[in-house]
């Protein structure tokens, strides 16, 4: 069982006053959605080029922890392209120099590609970047037709050239004085979340099956009186495994929110939409924002099954806990 060899002692995750999660990159953008309680939508002043956000196939979220008067932003993932990430951060008025840390969910290009060149625009300083050591591997998806989708990994030298302090870790990591938890490898315990069977990675001996994508990791925040907020890039470990692993790591059973990709799109994963949704209903997740690779069918099933918890994610949306 992947992850079972890692120590899973309860982690001392400091509770915070609140957290704001801003969707910086996602597959979907809609500037006409209305605010709802705890959810603020981006409002464009006009349809000129200056203040328009862009969507792309990728994910990035700004996770801003609130403790007293202090606001501490962490960038989780960087989307696919520098053009989209840089533009959206500018439009959303996010000062790059205010970032406290960066976390990469896994080594697929649609989660790290946007970081290229980003920090050359800001004053030179060292910024920690947490990444799993398997994220450097070259990957690809092989379709039933024989077509291949290459997934270029990040390059350590390029990240360090940006002024980033690369922190490789398989296990969990605490950031911001114990207020943000990076999960590290996710323990796989469900019977139905079996990985990505057409996913491959290059090793010294050539290409080999890599269905488990062991570098998949998420960030977890514990909000006082509300519970855990989990932000997950693709949930290649399985969204239910991600949820249960967060509970196991922290000892907290209340889930205030789950934001990010469920990777339930396509014929391989659609058969597990049902048990995934059932598990989230049973967990009584407070808010759910199924983004990026969740897939049209899964999004609609989640919306129907959890109407009070469901929030349609979109680039520029800020959800507060």
Residue ranges and their predicted role:
Residues 26-30, 35-92, 212, 216-231:
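Conserved beta-strand hairpin/beta-sheet module of binuclear metal-dependent hydrolase folds
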Residues 25-27, 78-80, 107, 134-135, ...:
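Active-site metal-binding loops of divalent metal-dependent hydrolases
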Residues 134-217, 281, 311-320:
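Metallo-beta-lactamase
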Residues 83-131, 250-257:
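Active-site metal-binding motif and surrounding structural segment of the metallo-beta-lactamase
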């Amino acid at each position: 069982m992947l992850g079972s060899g890692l120590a899973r002692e309860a982690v001392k995750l400091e509770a915070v006053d609140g957290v704001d999660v801003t969707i910086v990159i996602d597959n979907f953008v809609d500037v006409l959605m209305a605010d709802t309680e705890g959810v603020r939508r981006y409002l464009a002043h006009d349809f000129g080029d200056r203040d328009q956000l862009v969507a792309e196939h990728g994910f990035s979220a700004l996770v801003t922890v609130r403790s007293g008067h202090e606001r501490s932003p962490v960038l989780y993932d960087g989307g696919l392209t520098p053009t989209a990430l840089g533009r959206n951060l500018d439009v959303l008025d996010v000062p790059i120099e205010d970032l406290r840390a960066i976390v990469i969910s896994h080594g697929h290009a649609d989660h790290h590609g946007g970081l290229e060149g980003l920090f050359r625009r800001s004053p030179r300083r060292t910024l920690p970047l947490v990444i799993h050591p398997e994220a450097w591997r070259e990957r690809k998806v092989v379709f039933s037709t024989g077509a291949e989708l290459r997934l270029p990994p990040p390059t350590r030298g390029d990240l360090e050239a940006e002024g980033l302090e690369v922190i490789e870790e398989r296990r969990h990591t605490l950031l911001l004085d114990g207020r943000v938890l990076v999960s590290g490898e996710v323990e796989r315990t469900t019977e139905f979340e079996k990985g990505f069977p057409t996913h491959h990675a290059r090793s010294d001996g050539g290409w080999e099956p890599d269905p488990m994508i062991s570098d998949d990791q998420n960030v977890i925040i514990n909000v006082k009186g509300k519970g855990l907020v989990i932000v997950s890039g693709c949930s290649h470990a399985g969204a239910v495994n991600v949820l249960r692993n967060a509970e196991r790591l922290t000892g907290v059973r209340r889930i205030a929110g789950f934001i990010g990709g469920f990777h339930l799109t396509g014929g391989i994963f659609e058969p597990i939409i049902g048990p995934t949704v059932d598990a989230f209903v049973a967990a009584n997740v407070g808010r759910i924002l199924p983004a990026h690779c969740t897939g049209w069918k899964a999004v609609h099933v989640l919306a129907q099954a959890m109407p009070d918890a469901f929030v349609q994610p979109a680039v520029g949306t800020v959800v507060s806990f």
